[in-house]
Amino acid sequence: MTLNKKTNNENSSKTTPKLSKKTDFQNDFASKNYVFNPQDKVFQIAQVFGITSAVLIKKLLQLGLKADVNQTLEKDIVELLAKEYNIKVIEPQKEQTPPQLQPQKPPLTKSKLQAKPNQKLNLQKTPPIVTIMGHVDHGKTTLLDAIRKTRVVDQEFGGITQHIGAYQVEYQGNKITFIDTPGHEAFDKMRARGAKITDICILVVAVDDCVKPQTLEALKHAQKAQIPIIVALNKVDKPNNKTQQIMQELSSYDLLPEEWGGTTPYIAISALKREGLEKILEIILLFSEIQNLQTNPDQKAKGTVIEASLDKSLGPVATFIISDGNLKVGDIVVAGTSYGKIRSMEDENKKTPTKALPSQPVRVSGLKEVPQAGDIFYAVSNEKQARQIVSEKKTKTKETLAKPPSPLNLEDILQDLETEKPQELNIILKADTQGSLEALQGMIDKIKVSDLKVQLLRAAVGTITEKDIAFAKSSDSLLIGFNIKPAFSTLKSAQIQEVKITIHNVIYRIIEDIEQKLKSMIKPTFEEVVTGKVEVRKIFNISKVGNIAGCYVTQGIVNNSDFAKVMRNDEVLFKGKITSLKHLKDNIKSAKQGHECGILLDGFNDFEINDIIETSKLSKVEE
């Protein structure tokens, strides 16, 4: 590859090529001209353009072309791409033999993943916290089970394992914390509350399937949190392997594989056969070392609530993950708008430590109320201080809710209705057998009601548990059971926490319930309907109230609940809400054509004689 450089004098009046906003680096040798070489590969052309291979592959996908970093491109395609970066593609001179650029695989360095320096004293190495995410049936739980080397699914109903939403494993003398959060919604709620809850994300994709919407949703949340991502290509032991297709698609979302010149590790695994797990654990430790995760274990505890529920024996219980400091039995903590004295702590093995260190998950009791998943908790000096903090938080919440709404504008309301995001119905599904579960999943995937979406956050065999209720509460999900009988205590807990459980023994009844729920979520469509028109004939100034327009109704009917548009010489001066409609001194509901009335508007006083006020309302459009 040869670049035809020009001297500074020749280029002084010309601008340099415009580069993509997503460029990770700019090569010093990127110039106005590029000498085309048919042997140049995608990653080499990207270097010339001053962009990453991932950006160039994404551009090619937008053109409908699939390529990897080692693929060559036709000249017309290169010319099309070069135009965007103000680069001219020229033919090489016959006597020239363009030298080839050597592949430059970007190493995984601290510059990519460097954590902010911690200025606290007595900093010590902290175990990484890892979240496993992905589509509901691509093997997240199986991978967690395999890493933990216990059958969590089998022991959920009466075994010795204590489900606290997170657990630790040890590998090569290093501890790693895994969060057992089977849905990205709860993860996103934690991030939305300001919790840096996880250090690394494992994105699980089944190679016998493909990239699903829930896969991309999970990816989006991980990228928002700005954490390293490891792609686990699961079920490699099965036929119909679509690894290349998956890598190609995820590359367009800035997950360029290391073997293609990117920085994202793609690990082939079989969670069921426990193959490839050591490689994942090695990369987790590598990412942890690069991020230089450190905290001060000697200070007061701070961390995040992972799960919370109401236990019939212990009262409010919550799973804490400590992000800084240490938590001890007897500490006073504030968690969201709850507080209390830690009475007991348990880990996932039902051991009862008296102290929990950074990245350690523990299930605690002693809080006055059930906090929410994602709430920040921290230890305070005494109960009086905790009460004061919680009281102030609750007061601020009430003040926020009590704030008067801003002046209404009909066009703004219509725009809000039009741009409102499609609603989603979150579902947690439990069934008696794997066959029933798969049949229900297939039927639920086919449900279509308007533009509403069904998100199946969890699907598993077995009865409904306290863990399901806690997850349904935190993710605002509908909990559905097929051919199962939950324990009375579980149903009672769901009632206390206001979690709706639906149990059926006939599959189509479940589908009907879901469709009915979706139909109830459909928001009506509205349109603006003009109700009347008035002419301003007098202006009355009322102290402490403002100007009232004395009007004559020339068309239709004016109602006291209408919106108003003030016009002068065909120019719209104001759009807003009618505050008051009067006849003489009396408040009236409406004024008909040929009648007089007084109009007071919310936010407008500058009336002039002969102004026109057009009134309108929102009318529901029948489907």
From Swiss-Prot:
CDD domains: IF2_eIF5B, IF2_mtIF2_II, mtIF2_IVc. SUPFAM superfamilies: Initiation factor IF2/eIF5b, domain 3, P-loop containing nucleoside triphosphate hydrolases, Translation proteins. Residues 180-183 are annotated as: G3. GTP binds at residues 134-141, 180-184, 234-237. Gene3D superfamilies: P-loop containing nucleotide triphosphate hydrolases, Translation factors, Translation initiation factor IF- 2, domain 3. The keyword Cytoplasm applies. GO terms for cellular component: cytosol. Belongs to the TRAFAC class translation factor GTPase superfamily. Classic translation factor GTPase family. IF-2 subfamily. This is Translation initiation factor IF-2. It comes from Aster yellows witches'-broom phytoplasma (strain AYWB). The gene is infB.
